[in-house]
């Protein structure tokens, strides 16, 4: 289902617990709102047309601007204000995803192998020159 925006239209392709994927039709001169995502990355892949992506760095006076053309991709880290402007009408794809920490495990105990402890045994060298383990009866 397409949703109208001031700058064009967006169509949700997929949304699940790991990502969100949209096809956007952008109109020259259109500018999306300046916004941020607390936890999600935001990626832009341009199929046709041209897009300017602005990213306000944590030092609010520093603004990075990236022009993305056909076949090019850029991404914005979570927590940074950003905005796109359509320089030439076209089609782009917008992708949102969150990263998980590969080292997020907290261990309460250490793994182990259960074994029975044998305390009463004897090792003997037999007549065939091999060692054998004998349990002592007691």
Short names for language-model regions:
Residues 1-34, 40:
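A short glycine-rich, His/Asp/Glu-containing loop-to-beta-strand
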Residues 21-25, 43, 65, 73-75:
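Conserved hydrophobic/aromatic beta-strand scaffold that supports enzyme active sites
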Residues 31-33, 71-83, 100-101:
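Histidine-centered metal-chelating micro-motifs
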Residues 33, 53-55, 94:
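Short hydrophobic/aromatic-rich beta-strand segments that constitute the beta-sheet cores
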Residues 36-38, 45-46, 86-89:
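Short glycine/proline-enriched turns and hinge-like loops at secondary-structure junctions
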Residues 39-58:
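Glycine- and acidic-residue-biased ligand/ion/polar-headgroup-sensing regions
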Residues 57-79:
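Short acidic-glycine-tyrosine-enriched beta hairpin
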Residues 85-138:
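Double-stranded beta-helix
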